[in-house]
């Protein structure tokens, strides 16, 4: 049974709402509260702002509890309309800007879409991120072994241990060119590093996973198959972990970590530079 919703939460912005959503979610994660959230980006005109206000007010009337509103809005007229709503409104950016304004002795120059928008100042970084995503997609799951020397990290692991989502997160969030290579059941009789990968051992990072968790994930994909059996999963994990130890490849058990946590740990262990976009 799903837990009851304790509070309704709105993440609102005149831009992408990514900042409001990420910071608001980080704040809400500190409280043992079940939430139902709505993200409303590009609230850029009066009519849309009024519609959002009505949506907030309707929830308040239905539940008798003020919705929580995390907003990042540059346009004063839009911000004023949201503040007139029945929600508990928090400007998550201004809470940081005000003390910084004092410390820097500078007035802020707020511009909508500056954080995640495309502008002349970040075109080079944007192009680099797109190139990283293209590279990562082209080198997913061992599709291509060409130009592997251009990878910043090469993830290794058995099927369904988290290589693809982690690679894509590294590319999309940080502009990291991440290749990944799978070890499949047919490899297990004589598991060795492919000759094409050996010269790039310094770029390799291994992922592993608890066999029980791996079996559960595989069962959803191929029910009642040898591929998903606990015995097969145990054998594959054992062989791959032995390979990591033999070749001194750094590794991480992904079982209890989110994609974000896995990616961050990989970057830290491999000494990869963060690039924020």
Swiss-Prot record:
Protein's UniProt name: Putative phosphoenolpyruvate synthase regulatory protein
Annotated TM spans: none
Report the superkingdom from the record: Bacteria
Q: What InterPro entries does this protein's entry cite?
A: Kinase-pyrophosphorylase, PSRP
What role does it play?
Bifunctional serine/threonine kinase and phosphorylase involved in the regulation of the phosphoenolpyruvate synthase (PEPS) by catalyzing its phosphorylation/dephosphorylation.
So what does this thing catalyse? [pyruvate, water dikinase] + ADP = [pyruvate, water dikinase]-phosphate + AMP + H(+); [pyruvate, water dikinase]-phosphate + phosphate + H(+) = [pyruvate, water dikinase] + diphosphate
Q: What is the lineage of its organism?
A: Bacteria, Pseudomonadati, Pseudomonadota, Gammaproteobacteria, Enterobacterales
Q: Name one GO molecular function term.
A: ADP binding
